[in-house]
Amino acid sequence: TCSGLRSPAGVEASPWGDVFYTDNQGEWCGASKLSIMKPGDFHGHPHGIDSCKNEEWSFSVVDNVPNGKLFPEVKEEIPELRMPAVWFPYDKMGRSPAGMAWDMTEGEFGPFAGQLFVTDQYDASVLRVALEEVNGNWQGACFPFRMGFQCGAIRCEFGPDDSLLVGMTNRGWGGRGNSPFGLQRLRWTGETPFEIHTMSAIPGGFRLRFTSKINVDVSAQKTSFKMKSYTYKLHSGYGSPEVDTKDLNITAVIANEDALGLDIMVDGLRSGYVHELSADGVSSASGSSLLHKQAYYTLIEFAD
């Protein structure tokens, strides 16, 4: 029911019934991504369009895909183009996202219940994704989670003991790690790391929620953060650099009353762009720095 996929390495139904897939950077796919699949969607790669001309295809047929324009520009020309829920910036968030699993352990795997974990084949890592629905569109942020697996991680599944089983191989494509294949178990130690729990869109900016209370005096400062935004080209070349990059002005940082969150107000938010956040200055109430200081939010719909 969808066209324009490039190299889907993972397909999974969400707990609420929607189907998502991961795709790998390459021709007509500017960066690796996570996307929802809806009937009639076009995901950007034109090589499979001819099959949509068969009588079994009951949706509109996309034709004349522009070569070299920015993804948000093509979306204006081709309404059927499905913008990703999450872009995975190249090398910052792996290179080859694959299988995925939602954490339905209700806290037995740690503080990220309900979030999505995605394996990466090249990086031998597991990434973390926090999705939200804004004006009927799924979008959200991705974060580093765990690196250093035996080799390329391609599948994951939660086991009956609420640990995450990760299946791996380096067959076909090289990746980090020196084993030809592997199966490893990732368990929560019971200690909660100081992390950005979620990054969500609010009018004029983003809300960060943390896994433990912050030092408000230190963290609620504009100098604690940096943000830039960029997007990608839709073209026949292999992948796309980050393009149309802009440093964004953070105008205010407002602490939530419970000291577990910050509202970051930003000038110049752009639809169809990754908003990359660096939170180097954030400190917990106990004086800890964030375990991972970067977050990458793919903004498609603005929050009302």
Role assignments for model-derived ranges:
Residues E56-S60, Y122, G205, Y232, ...:
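Charge-rich, low-complexity amphipathic helices
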Residues P46, P66, I78, V134, ...:
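Intrinsically disordered, low-complexity segments enriched in small/polar residues
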Residues F194, L248-I250, L262-I264:
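Short structured motifs
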Residues G190-E195, N215, T231-K233, S240-E242, ...:
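Acidic, Ser/Thr/Gly/Pro-rich low-complexity segments and short DxT(G/T)-type signature motifs
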Residues T1-I202, V216:
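Beta-propeller domains with acidic blade repeats across secreted/periplasmic ectodomains
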Residues S3, T198-A201, M227, A255, ...:
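Hydrophobic/anchoring residues in structured secondary elements
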Residues A220-N256:
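Intrinsically disordered, low-complexity Ser/Thr/Gly-rich stretches
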Residues G204-S229, N256-H292:
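Extracytoplasmic/surface-exposed domains of secreted proteins
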